Protein backbone atom coordinates (compact mmCIF):
# COMPACT_ATOMS: atom_id res chain seq x y z
CA UNK A 1 0.00 0.00 0.00
CA UNK A 2 1.05 3.60 -0.52
CA UNK A 3 0.08 6.78 1.23
CA UNK A 4 -1.57 9.79 -0.37
CA UNK A 5 1.92 11.17 -0.91
CA UNK A 6 3.07 8.13 -2.86
CA UNK A 7 5.21 6.78 0.01
CA UNK A 8 4.99 3.20 1.29
CA UNK A 9 3.03 2.84 4.52
CA UNK A 10 4.78 -0.42 5.49
CA UNK A 11 7.43 -2.86 4.31
CA UNK A 12 7.55 -6.62 4.61
CA UNK A 13 9.73 -8.43 7.14
CA UNK A 14 11.81 -9.80 4.25
CA UNK A 15 12.44 -6.30 2.88
CA UNK A 16 13.36 -5.07 6.34
CA UNK A 17 15.83 -7.91 6.88
CA UNK A 18 17.37 -7.37 3.43
CA UNK A 19 17.77 -3.63 4.00
CA UNK A 20 19.32 -4.29 7.41
CA UNK A 21 21.74 -6.81 5.92
CA UNK A 22 22.83 -4.37 3.20
CA UNK A 23 23.28 -1.59 5.76
CA UNK A 24 25.35 -3.85 8.02
CA UNK A 25 27.47 -5.00 5.07
CA UNK A 26 28.18 -1.43 3.97
CA UNK A 27 28.94 -0.44 7.56
CA UNK A 28 31.27 -3.43 7.97
CA UNK A 29 33.11 -2.75 4.69
CA UNK A 30 33.52 0.92 5.60
CA UNK A 31 34.85 -0.01 9.03
CA UNK A 32 37.12 -2.74 7.70
CA UNK A 33 38.65 -0.35 5.15
CA UNK A 34 39.79 1.98 7.92
CA UNK A 35 43.20 1.07 9.32
CA UNK A 36 43.42 0.22 12.99
CA UNK A 37 44.86 3.24 14.80
CA UNK A 38 47.63 2.42 17.31
CA UNK A 39 47.06 3.37 20.91
CA UNK A 40 48.04 6.95 21.67
CA UNK A 41 47.46 8.22 18.12
CA UNK A 42 44.40 9.84 16.54
CA UNK A 43 42.49 9.05 13.37
CA UNK A 44 42.93 11.61 10.59
CA UNK A 45 40.14 14.23 10.50
CA UNK A 46 38.41 15.27 7.31
CA UNK A 47 35.12 16.21 5.68
CA UNK A 48 32.35 13.79 4.80
CA UNK A 49 32.61 12.66 1.16
CA UNK A 50 30.14 11.40 -1.42
CA UNK A 51 29.89 7.64 -1.95
CA UNK A 52 32.04 6.50 -4.89
CA UNK A 53 33.11 10.07 -5.73
CA UNK A 54 34.68 11.06 -2.44
CA UNK A 55 35.66 14.74 -2.48
CA UNK A 56 36.22 15.19 -6.22
CA UNK A 57 33.36 17.69 -6.49
CA UNK A 58 34.63 19.60 -3.46
CA UNK A 59 37.95 20.40 -5.14
CA UNK A 60 36.41 22.28 -8.08
CA UNK A 61 38.55 24.17 -10.60
CA UNK A 62 41.09 25.36 -8.03
CA UNK A 63 41.95 22.42 -5.76
CA UNK A 64 44.76 24.34 -4.03
CA UNK A 65 42.31 26.99 -2.84
CA UNK A 66 39.63 24.45 -1.86
CA UNK A 67 42.11 22.42 0.19
CA UNK A 68 43.52 25.56 1.83
CA UNK A 69 39.97 26.41 2.88
CA UNK A 70 39.48 22.92 4.33
CA UNK A 71 42.75 23.22 6.25
CA UNK A 72 41.32 26.19 8.15
CA UNK A 73 38.58 23.88 9.44
CA UNK A 74 40.38 20.56 9.87
CA UNK A 75 43.96 21.65 10.55
CA UNK A 76 47.30 21.18 8.81
CA UNK A 77 46.92 17.38 8.58
CA UNK A 78 43.63 16.00 7.29
CA UNK A 79 42.31 13.42 4.88
CA UNK A 80 40.06 13.45 1.83
CA UNK A 81 39.03 10.75 -0.62
CA UNK A 82 39.37 10.81 -4.39
CA UNK A 83 37.08 8.04 -5.49
CA UNK A 84 37.86 5.31 -2.99
CA UNK A 85 41.49 6.41 -2.56
CA UNK A 86 42.33 8.15 0.74
CA UNK A 87 44.66 11.15 0.37
CA UNK A 88 46.40 12.96 3.22
CA UNK A 89 46.68 16.73 2.73
CA UNK A 90 49.51 18.68 4.39
CA UNK A 91 49.44 22.44 4.94
CA UNK A 92 51.39 24.87 7.10
CA UNK A 93 55.15 25.42 7.00
CA UNK A 94 55.98 23.63 10.26
CA UNK A 95 53.89 20.58 9.35
CA UNK A 96 55.32 20.34 5.83
CA UNK A 97 58.90 20.68 7.11
CA UNK A 98 58.25 18.06 9.78
CA UNK A 99 57.00 15.60 7.18
CA UNK A 100 59.39 16.20 4.29
CA UNK A 101 62.57 17.11 6.17
CA UNK A 102 62.59 15.79 9.73
CA UNK A 103 60.59 12.67 8.80
CA UNK A 104 61.85 12.64 5.23
CA UNK A 105 62.37 8.88 5.03
CA UNK A 106 58.73 8.31 6.01
CA UNK A 107 57.34 10.61 3.30
CA UNK A 108 59.83 10.20 0.42
CA UNK A 109 57.72 7.73 -1.56
CA UNK A 110 55.63 8.34 -4.67
CA UNK A 111 52.15 6.86 -5.05
CA UNK A 112 51.87 4.20 -7.73
CA UNK A 113 49.45 6.26 -9.82
CA UNK A 114 48.28 4.88 -13.16
CA UNK A 115 49.23 8.02 -15.12
CA UNK A 116 52.76 8.02 -13.68
CA UNK A 117 53.44 4.69 -15.41
CA UNK A 118 53.31 6.44 -18.79
CA UNK A 119 55.92 9.09 -17.92
CA UNK A 120 59.27 8.00 -19.40
CA UNK A 121 57.83 4.49 -19.88
CA UNK A 122 57.75 4.06 -16.13
CA UNK A 123 61.48 4.85 -15.83
CA UNK A 124 61.05 8.36 -14.42
CA UNK A 125 63.26 9.26 -11.49
CA UNK A 126 60.84 12.07 -10.58
CA UNK A 127 57.47 10.31 -10.96
CA UNK A 128 58.50 6.70 -10.32
CA UNK A 129 57.40 4.98 -7.12
CA UNK A 130 60.89 3.64 -6.32
CA UNK A 131 62.53 5.40 -3.37
CA UNK A 132 65.22 2.88 -2.48
CA UNK A 133 68.96 2.58 -3.23
CA UNK A 134 68.49 2.43 -7.03
CA UNK A 135 66.50 5.66 -7.02
CA UNK A 136 68.96 7.36 -4.65
CA UNK A 137 71.92 6.36 -6.86
CA UNK A 138 70.22 7.66 -10.01
CA UNK A 139 69.37 10.90 -8.26
CA UNK A 140 73.01 11.43 -7.22
CA UNK A 141 74.14 10.61 -10.74
CA UNK A 142 71.69 13.09 -12.27
CA UNK A 143 72.72 15.77 -9.77
CA UNK A 144 76.42 15.31 -10.56
CA UNK A 145 75.82 15.40 -14.32
CA UNK A 146 73.67 18.51 -13.97
CA UNK A 147 76.34 20.28 -11.92
CA UNK A 148 79.06 19.29 -14.40
CA UNK A 149 77.37 21.16 -17.23
CA UNK A 150 75.80 24.05 -15.39
CA UNK A 151 77.56 25.48 -12.34
CA UNK A 152 80.97 23.99 -13.27
CA UNK A 153 83.35 26.41 -15.02
CA UNK A 154 84.08 26.35 -18.73
CA UNK A 155 87.82 26.95 -19.24
CA UNK A 156 87.30 28.02 -22.85
CA UNK A 157 84.81 30.78 -22.02
CA UNK A 158 84.92 34.18 -20.36
CA UNK A 159 81.74 33.23 -18.49
CA UNK A 160 82.02 31.87 -14.96
CA UNK A 161 80.29 28.60 -15.91
CA UNK A 162 78.48 26.78 -18.70
CA UNK A 163 75.06 27.86 -17.46
CA UNK A 164 76.00 31.54 -17.37
CA UNK A 165 77.35 31.33 -20.91
CA UNK A 166 74.21 29.66 -22.28
CA UNK A 167 71.75 31.96 -20.48
CA UNK A 168 73.62 35.15 -21.45
CA UNK A 169 73.67 34.05 -25.09
CA UNK A 170 69.98 33.18 -25.14
CA UNK A 171 68.98 36.40 -23.35
CA UNK A 172 70.86 38.44 -25.97
CA UNK A 173 69.15 36.49 -28.76
CA UNK A 174 65.80 37.10 -27.07
CA UNK A 175 66.40 40.86 -27.00
CA UNK A 176 67.27 40.80 -30.71
CA UNK A 177 64.07 38.87 -31.41
CA UNK A 178 61.99 41.42 -29.50
CA UNK A 179 63.56 44.23 -31.56
CA UNK A 180 62.70 42.41 -34.79
CA UNK A 181 59.10 41.96 -33.68
CA UNK A 182 58.75 45.59 -32.64
CA UNK A 183 60.07 46.72 -36.02
CA UNK A 184 57.78 44.33 -37.89
CA UNK A 185 54.44 44.48 -36.02
CA UNK A 186 54.94 46.72 -32.97
CA UNK A 187 53.90 44.17 -30.32
CA UNK A 188 54.40 40.52 -29.39
CA UNK A 189 53.59 37.69 -26.98
CA UNK A 190 56.78 37.21 -24.91
CA UNK A 191 55.88 33.72 -23.70
CA UNK A 192 56.31 32.02 -27.06
CA UNK A 193 59.85 33.39 -27.40
CA UNK A 194 60.90 33.03 -23.76
CA UNK A 195 60.01 29.34 -23.85
CA UNK A 196 62.20 28.84 -26.93
CA UNK A 197 65.16 30.57 -25.30
CA UNK A 198 64.82 28.62 -22.06
CA UNK A 199 64.40 25.36 -24.00
CA UNK A 200 67.63 26.18 -25.83
CA UNK A 201 69.50 26.46 -22.52
CA UNK A 202 68.47 22.98 -21.43
CA UNK A 203 69.08 21.66 -24.98
CA UNK A 204 72.63 23.02 -24.82
CA UNK A 205 73.26 21.38 -21.45
CA UNK A 206 71.58 18.05 -22.24
CA UNK A 207 72.37 17.66 -25.94
CA UNK A 208 75.20 20.12 -26.63
CA UNK A 209 73.29 22.15 -29.22
CA UNK A 210 70.96 25.08 -29.63
CA UNK A 211 68.22 25.72 -32.18
CA UNK A 212 67.00 28.75 -34.11
CA UNK A 213 63.66 30.06 -32.86
CA UNK A 214 61.95 28.96 -36.08
CA UNK A 215 63.50 25.48 -36.06
CA UNK A 216 60.70 22.96 -36.54
CA UNK A 217 62.25 20.37 -34.23
CA UNK A 218 62.41 22.81 -31.32
CA UNK A 219 58.95 24.19 -32.11
CA UNK A 220 57.57 20.66 -32.05
CA UNK A 221 59.20 20.03 -28.68
CA UNK A 222 57.86 23.25 -27.17
CA UNK A 223 54.38 22.53 -28.51
CA UNK A 224 54.57 19.07 -26.96
CA UNK A 225 55.33 20.65 -23.60
CA UNK A 226 52.37 23.04 -23.93
CA UNK A 227 50.05 20.16 -24.80
CA UNK A 228 51.40 18.10 -21.89
CA UNK A 229 50.69 20.97 -19.49
CA UNK A 230 47.13 21.39 -20.74
CA UNK A 231 46.33 17.69 -20.47
CA UNK A 232 48.03 17.33 -17.08
CA UNK A 233 46.07 20.37 -15.84
CA UNK A 234 42.82 18.42 -16.14
CA UNK A 235 44.23 15.75 -13.85
CA UNK A 236 43.89 12.03 -14.41
CA UNK A 237 40.65 10.65 -12.95
CA UNK A 238 41.84 7.17 -14.00
CA UNK A 239 44.38 7.41 -11.17
CA UNK A 240 41.55 7.22 -8.65
CA UNK A 241 38.64 5.63 -10.56
CA UNK A 242 39.67 2.17 -11.77
CA UNK A 243 36.81 1.76 -14.26
CA UNK A 244 37.97 4.80 -16.28
CA UNK A 245 41.08 2.89 -17.32
CA UNK A 246 38.90 0.53 -19.36
CA UNK A 247 36.48 3.05 -20.88
CA UNK A 248 37.13 5.38 -23.84
CA UNK A 249 39.26 8.19 -22.40
CA UNK A 250 40.47 10.78 -24.95
CA UNK A 251 42.37 12.82 -22.33
CA UNK A 252 44.28 9.77 -21.11
CA UNK A 253 44.99 8.69 -24.70
CA UNK A 254 46.42 12.15 -25.41
CA UNK A 255 48.53 11.95 -22.24
CA UNK A 256 49.94 8.58 -23.31
CA UNK A 257 50.69 9.87 -26.81
CA UNK A 258 52.47 12.98 -25.55
CA UNK A 259 54.67 10.92 -23.27
CA UNK A 260 55.50 8.56 -26.13
CA UNK A 261 56.54 11.49 -28.32
CA UNK A 262 58.65 13.06 -25.57
CA UNK A 263 60.33 9.71 -25.00
CA UNK A 264 60.99 9.16 -28.72
CA UNK A 265 62.57 12.61 -29.09
CA UNK A 266 64.89 12.06 -26.13
CA UNK A 267 65.68 8.47 -27.09
CA UNK A 268 66.80 9.59 -30.55
CA UNK A 269 69.10 12.24 -29.06
CA UNK A 270 70.62 9.64 -26.71
CA UNK A 271 71.14 7.20 -29.62
CA UNK A 272 72.93 9.93 -31.60
CA UNK A 273 75.21 10.54 -28.62
CA UNK A 274 75.90 6.82 -28.22
CA UNK A 275 77.00 6.61 -31.87
CA UNK A 276 79.38 9.59 -31.60
CA UNK A 277 80.53 9.13 -28.00
CA UNK A 278 84.23 9.63 -27.20
CA UNK A 279 85.24 9.02 -23.61
CA UNK A 280 87.93 11.70 -23.76
CA UNK A 281 85.51 14.34 -25.08
CA UNK A 282 82.45 14.70 -22.84
CA UNK A 283 80.22 17.26 -24.52
CA UNK A 284 77.13 17.50 -22.32
CA UNK A 285 74.92 15.84 -19.71
CA UNK A 286 73.99 12.97 -22.03
CA UNK A 287 77.66 12.17 -22.67
CA UNK A 288 78.32 12.31 -18.94
CA UNK A 289 75.63 9.70 -18.31
CA UNK A 290 76.83 7.48 -21.17
CA UNK A 291 80.36 7.63 -19.77
CA UNK A 292 79.02 6.51 -16.43
CA UNK A 293 77.53 3.25 -17.67
CA UNK A 294 80.04 2.56 -20.48
CA UNK A 295 83.29 3.52 -18.76
CA UNK A 296 82.67 3.88 -15.03
CA UNK A 297 80.11 1.03 -15.15
CA UNK A 298 78.83 1.30 -11.59
CA UNK A 299 77.75 3.97 -9.18
CA UNK A 300 80.46 4.12 -6.57
CA UNK A 301 77.97 4.55 -3.74
CA UNK A 302 75.29 1.97 -4.44
CA UNK A 303 76.68 -0.41 -7.09
CA UNK A 304 73.69 0.30 -9.32
CA UNK A 305 74.03 -0.20 -13.08
CA UNK A 306 72.51 2.52 -15.28
CA UNK A 307 71.14 1.16 -18.57
CA UNK A 308 70.34 2.88 -21.87
CA UNK A 309 66.69 3.10 -20.80
CA UNK A 310 67.61 4.62 -17.45
CA UNK A 311 69.82 7.16 -19.26
CA UNK A 312 66.91 8.21 -21.47
CA UNK A 313 64.75 8.48 -18.35
CA UNK A 314 67.23 10.68 -16.48
CA UNK A 315 67.79 12.98 -19.47
CA UNK A 316 64.04 13.28 -20.05
CA UNK A 317 63.44 14.07 -16.38
CA UNK A 318 66.10 16.79 -16.43
CA UNK A 319 64.92 18.15 -19.76
CA UNK A 320 61.23 18.21 -18.87
CA UNK A 321 61.81 19.86 -15.50
CA UNK A 322 64.46 22.17 -16.88
CA UNK A 323 62.44 24.59 -18.92
CA UNK A 324 58.76 24.68 -18.00
CA UNK A 325 59.37 25.98 -14.46
CA UNK A 326 61.92 28.59 -15.59
CA UNK A 327 59.75 29.73 -18.50
CA UNK A 328 56.72 30.13 -16.24
CA UNK A 329 58.72 32.11 -13.66
CA UNK A 330 60.13 34.54 -16.26
CA UNK A 331 56.78 34.92 -18.00
CA UNK A 332 54.95 35.72 -14.74
CA UNK A 333 57.71 38.17 -13.77
CA UNK A 334 57.28 40.10 -17.01
CA UNK A 335 53.52 40.24 -16.46
CA UNK A 336 54.01 41.82 -13.03
CA UNK A 337 56.58 44.29 -14.38
CA UNK A 338 54.31 45.68 -17.11
CA UNK A 339 51.43 46.06 -14.65
CA UNK A 340 53.71 47.58 -11.98
CA UNK A 341 56.10 49.89 -13.88
CA UNK A 342 57.38 51.43 -10.63
CA UNK A 343 58.86 48.07 -9.65
CA UNK A 344 60.40 47.67 -13.12
CA UNK A 345 62.07 51.09 -12.87
CA UNK A 346 63.41 50.32 -9.41
CA UNK A 347 65.04 47.10 -10.66
CA UNK A 348 66.61 49.00 -13.56
CA UNK A 349 67.96 51.69 -11.24
CA UNK A 350 69.58 48.96 -9.15
CA UNK A 351 71.07 47.34 -12.27
CA UNK A 352 72.43 50.69 -13.48
CA UNK A 353 74.08 51.33 -10.12
CA UNK A 354 75.59 47.86 -9.67
CA UNK A 355 76.27 46.54 -13.19
CA UNK A 356 76.22 49.70 -15.27
CA UNK A 357 75.79 49.57 -19.02
CA UNK A 358 79.28 48.72 -20.24
CA UNK A 359 79.03 45.00 -19.42
CA UNK A 360 76.40 42.32 -19.04
CA UNK A 361 75.13 40.98 -15.68
CA UNK A 362 76.85 37.92 -14.21
CA UNK A 363 75.87 35.36 -11.59
CA UNK A 364 78.41 37.03 -9.31
CA UNK A 365 76.26 40.21 -9.34
CA UNK A 366 73.36 38.43 -7.65
CA UNK A 367 74.31 39.26 -4.02
CA UNK A 368 74.56 42.95 -4.96
CA UNK A 369 71.07 43.02 -6.54
CA UNK A 370 68.78 42.42 -3.54
CA UNK A 371 65.74 44.22 -4.96
CA UNK A 372 65.71 42.08 -8.11
CA UNK A 373 66.04 39.01 -5.89
CA UNK A 374 63.14 40.23 -3.73
CA UNK A 375 60.94 40.69 -6.82
CA UNK A 376 61.74 37.16 -7.98
CA UNK A 377 60.92 35.74 -4.55
CA UNK A 378 57.65 37.66 -4.38
CA UNK A 379 56.75 36.36 -7.85
CA UNK A 380 57.40 32.81 -6.65
CA UNK A 381 55.30 33.38 -3.53
CA UNK A 382 52.43 35.39 -4.98
CA UNK A 383 51.84 33.18 -8.02
CA UNK A 384 52.75 29.89 -6.31
CA UNK A 385 52.69 28.59 -9.87
CA UNK A 386 53.61 25.13 -8.59
CA UNK A 387 50.64 24.89 -6.18
CA UNK A 388 51.39 21.32 -5.11
CA UNK A 389 54.49 19.20 -5.08
CA UNK A 390 54.28 16.01 -7.11
CA UNK A 391 52.30 13.70 -4.79
CA UNK A 392 54.26 11.90 -2.09
CA UNK A 393 53.43 8.65 -0.32
CA UNK A 394 54.39 7.15 3.00
CA UNK A 395 57.04 4.43 2.90
CA UNK A 396 56.01 2.94 6.26
CA UNK A 397 53.43 3.35 9.02
CA UNK A 398 54.07 6.72 10.61
CA UNK A 399 52.44 9.59 12.48
CA UNK A 400 52.35 13.35 12.06
CA UNK A 401 50.96 15.85 14.54
CA UNK A 402 49.62 12.98 16.62
CA UNK A 403 47.69 11.48 13.68
CA UNK A 404 48.28 7.95 12.43
CA UNK A 405 49.18 7.62 8.72
CA UNK A 406 49.56 4.07 7.36
CA UNK A 407 52.16 2.91 4.86
CA UNK A 408 51.39 3.59 1.20
CA UNK A 409 49.08 6.55 1.84
CA UNK A 410 49.04 9.17 -0.95
CA UNK A 411 50.06 12.63 0.32
CA UNK A 412 49.33 16.05 -1.22
CA UNK A 413 51.56 18.95 -0.11
CA UNK A 414 49.78 22.30 -0.57
CA UNK A 415 52.57 24.78 -1.31
CA UNK A 416 50.05 27.45 -2.33
CA UNK A 417 48.47 27.40 1.14
CA UNK A 418 51.85 27.96 2.78
CA UNK A 419 52.68 30.85 0.44
CA UNK A 420 49.30 32.49 1.14
CA UNK A 421 49.09 31.83 4.86
CA UNK A 422 48.05 35.12 6.57
CA UNK A 423 49.79 34.07 9.78
CA UNK A 424 53.06 33.83 7.87
CA UNK A 425 52.75 36.74 5.44
CA UNK A 426 50.27 39.19 6.97
CA UNK A 427 48.99 40.48 3.62
CA UNK A 428 49.46 37.47 1.30
CA UNK A 429 47.26 38.85 -1.49
CA UNK A 430 49.44 41.95 -1.90
CA UNK A 431 52.38 41.86 -4.32
CA UNK A 432 55.02 43.51 -2.15
CA UNK A 433 58.68 42.62 -2.89
CA UNK A 434 59.90 44.77 0.00
CA UNK A 435 58.71 42.10 2.44
CA UNK A 436 61.85 40.12 1.51
CA UNK A 437 64.24 42.96 2.40
CA UNK A 438 65.67 43.75 5.82
CA UNK A 439 65.68 47.36 7.10
CA UNK A 440 69.25 47.65 5.75
CA UNK A 441 68.11 46.62 2.26
CA UNK A 442 69.62 43.13 2.24
CA UNK A 443 67.68 40.00 1.30
CA UNK A 444 65.96 38.45 4.31
CA UNK A 445 67.31 34.90 3.93
CA UNK A 446 65.17 33.51 6.74
CA UNK A 447 61.98 34.74 5.07
CA UNK A 448 62.96 33.53 1.58
CA UNK A 449 63.31 30.02 3.02
CA UNK A 450 59.63 30.10 3.98
CA UNK A 451 58.55 30.27 0.33
CA UNK A 452 57.77 26.80 -1.01
CA UNK A 453 57.99 26.19 -4.74
CA UNK A 454 60.52 23.43 -5.42
CA UNK A 455 59.50 21.05 -2.64
CA UNK A 456 61.56 20.05 0.38
CA UNK A 457 63.57 17.13 1.66
CA UNK A 458 64.57 13.99 -0.19
CA UNK A 459 62.27 14.69 -3.16
CA UNK A 460 63.26 18.34 -3.50
CA UNK A 461 63.78 19.39 -7.13
CA UNK A 462 67.41 18.73 -8.06
CA UNK A 463 67.32 21.65 -10.49
CA UNK A 464 66.28 24.27 -7.94
CA UNK A 465 69.65 26.04 -7.73
CA UNK A 466 70.04 26.11 -11.49
CA UNK A 467 66.45 27.25 -12.01
CA UNK A 468 66.87 30.17 -9.62
CA UNK A 469 70.11 31.21 -11.35
CA UNK A 470 68.48 31.05 -14.78
CA UNK A 471 65.52 33.19 -13.76
CA UNK A 472 67.87 35.74 -12.18
CA UNK A 473 70.21 36.08 -15.17
CA UNK A 474 67.48 36.12 -17.82
CA UNK A 475 65.63 38.91 -15.99
CA UNK A 476 68.79 40.86 -15.14
CA UNK A 477 69.96 40.81 -18.77
CA UNK A 478 66.55 41.66 -20.21
CA UNK A 479 65.82 44.49 -17.77
CA UNK A 480 69.30 45.99 -18.07
CA UNK A 481 68.70 46.61 -21.77
CA UNK A 482 64.93 46.71 -22.31
CA UNK A 483 61.95 48.61 -20.93
CA UNK A 484 58.77 46.53 -21.17
CA UNK A 485 55.21 47.83 -21.46
CA UNK A 486 51.91 46.89 -23.10
CA UNK A 487 50.05 48.65 -25.88
CA UNK A 488 47.90 51.56 -24.64
CA UNK A 489 44.44 50.44 -23.55
CA UNK A 490 45.49 46.81 -23.06
CA UNK A 491 44.00 45.00 -20.07
CA UNK A 492 46.42 42.43 -18.67
CA UNK A 493 44.69 39.34 -17.26
CA UNK A 494 46.65 38.12 -14.21
CA UNK A 495 44.21 35.35 -13.25
CA UNK A 496 46.13 32.09 -12.66
CA UNK A 497 44.96 29.14 -14.74
CA UNK A 498 45.18 25.97 -12.66
CA UNK A 499 47.49 23.26 -13.93
CA UNK A 500 50.62 21.28 -13.29
CA UNK A 501 52.22 24.71 -13.41
CA UNK A 502 49.75 27.59 -13.15
CA UNK A 503 50.00 29.86 -16.17
CA UNK A 504 48.50 33.26 -16.94
CA UNK A 505 46.43 34.11 -19.99
CA UNK A 506 48.71 34.89 -22.92
CA UNK A 507 49.18 38.57 -23.70
CA UNK A 508 50.03 39.47 -27.31
CA UNK A 509 50.38 43.20 -26.71
CA UNK A 510 53.78 43.45 -25.05
CA UNK A 511 56.11 46.17 -26.27
CA UNK A 512 59.87 46.48 -25.77
CA UNK A 513 62.06 49.59 -26.06
CA UNK A 514 65.84 49.54 -25.79
CA UNK A 515 67.04 51.60 -22.83
CA UNK A 516 70.35 52.43 -24.53
CA UNK A 517 72.34 51.54 -27.63
CA UNK A 518 74.68 48.59 -27.16
Curated annotation (Swiss-Prot):
GO terms for molecular function: arachidonate monooxygenase activity; estrogen 16-alpha-hydroxylase activity; estrogen 2-hydroxylase activity; heme binding; Hsp70 protein binding; Hsp90 protein binding; hydroperoxy icosatetraenoate dehydratase activity; iron ion binding. It is a peripheral membrane protein. It catalyses: an organic molecule + reduced [NADPH--hemoprotein reductase] + O2 = an alcohol + oxidized [NADPH--hemoprotein reductase] + H2O + H(+); estrone + reduced [NADPH--hemoprotein reductase] + O2 = 2-hydroxyestrone + oxidized [NADPH--hemoprotein reductase] + H2O + H(+); estrone + reduced [NADPH--hemoprotein reductase] + O2 = 4-hydroxyestrone + oxidized [NADPH--hemoprotein reductase] + H2O + H(+); estrone + reduced [NADPH--hemoprotein reductase] + O2 = 6alpha-hydroxyestrone + oxidized [NADPH--hemoprotein reductase] + H2O + H(+). Disulfide bonds: none annotated. This is Cytochrome P450 1A1. Interacts with cytosolic chaperones HSP70 and HSP90; this interaction is required for initial targeting to mitochondria. Interacts (via mitochondrial targeting signal) with TOMM40 (via N-terminus); this interaction is required for translocation across the mitochondrial outer membrane. One of its GO terms (cellular component) is endoplasmic reticulum membrane. Glycans are attached at residue 71. A cytochrome P450 monooxygenase involved in the metabolism of various endogenous substrates, including fatty acids, steroid hormones and vitamins. Mechanistically, uses molecular oxygen inserting one oxygen atom into a substrate, and reducing the second into a water molecule, with two electrons provided by NADPH via cytochrome P450 reductase (CPR; NADPH-ferrihemoprotein reductase). Catalyzes the hydroxylation of carbon-hydrogen bonds.
